[in-house]
């Protein structure tokens, strides 16, 4: 597994590659042209993850909830980069919209200050960008149905671009948000088998999980443990999962 030092910081895309490898998900380096036919369950999972997070963003905007907007934007980046890793689409490469600085690397260099009046001053602009993100997801869904990996690549990058534009409009450092989401996502791991067993028992008590088969397996480091939905393959959180904290970014 690649170990990035402080002097060689991973890009956002590379960080998600670290997550995928640690949790036993693919981190491919070449286009997976046959993935639509050979692994449709994985394709569906990746689409569903993006759809879920885009829906969270729509809800956050409708509720004028800045904290949830930050959270949703960070999560959208994560699942879009995740789909890129699985499909072998290097989202560190320059995307289709050349006028926009490359998402995730290098970082934007500006002083950020969240505009707490954005819903009164720029609501229509925010809404337009969120609509663009939703529309692009629909285009992505269609491209997957058509098994067109070139268009899938285009739409993934376009979603990233619009999310970065939204973060710029609202006034927050999306790369910092992403870093916090990444640290939080890595805390989904159980540190030992005892934590994994406790987490399995914990899910048995949660509403909505009555018919869900939750299992655990060793992570690739052969030390920590991954909790997952046995039917869908979706990664689930450790009982000791730590939510990302954005409170200081909203001050």
From Swiss-Prot:
SUPFAM superfamilies: all-alpha NTP pyrophosphatases (SSF101386)
Pfam families, per the entry: PRA-PH (PF01503)
Native organism: Acanthamoeba polyphaga mimivirus
InterPro entries: NTP-PPase_DR2231-like (IPR033653), NTP_PyroPHydrolase-like_dom_sf (IPR023292), PRib-ATP_PPHydrolase-like (IPR021130)
Name used for this protein in its record: Uncharacterized protein L479
Superkingdom classification of source: Viruses
Lineage: Viruses, Varidnaviria, Bamfordvirae, Nucleocytoviricota, Megaviricetes
């Amino acid at each position: 597994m690649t170990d990035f030092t402080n002097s060689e910081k991973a890009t956002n895309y590379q960080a998600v590659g670290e997550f995928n490898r640690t949790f036993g998900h693919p981190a491919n380096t070449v286009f997976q042209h046959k993935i639509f036919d050979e692994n449709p369950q994985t394709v569906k999972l990746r689409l569903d993850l993006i759809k879920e997070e885009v829906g969270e963003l729509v809800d956050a905007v409708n509720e004028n909830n800045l904290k949830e907007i930050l959270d949703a934007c960070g999560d959208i980046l994560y699942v879009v980069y995740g789909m890129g890793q699985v499909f072998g689409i290097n989202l560190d490469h320059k995307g289709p919209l050349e006028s926009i600085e490359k998402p995730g690397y290098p970082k934007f260099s500006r002083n950020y200050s969240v505009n707490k009046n954005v819903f009164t001053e720029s609501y229509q602009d925010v809404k337009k960008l969120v609509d663009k993100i939703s529309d692009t997801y629909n285009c992505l869904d269609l491209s997957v149905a058509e098994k067109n990996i070139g268009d899938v690549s285009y739409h993934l990058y376009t979603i990233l671009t619009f999310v970065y534009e939204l973060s710029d409009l609202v006034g927050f450092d999306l790369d910092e948000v992403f870093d916090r989401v990444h640290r939080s996502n890595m805390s989904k791991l159980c540190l030992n088998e005892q934590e994994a067993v406790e987490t399995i028992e914990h899910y048995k008590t949660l509403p909505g999980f009555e018919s869900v088969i939750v299992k655990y397996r060793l992570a690739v480091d052969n030390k920590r443990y991954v909790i997952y939905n046995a039917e869908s393959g979706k990664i689930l959180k450790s009982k000791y999962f730590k939510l990302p904290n954005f409170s200081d970014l909203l001050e």
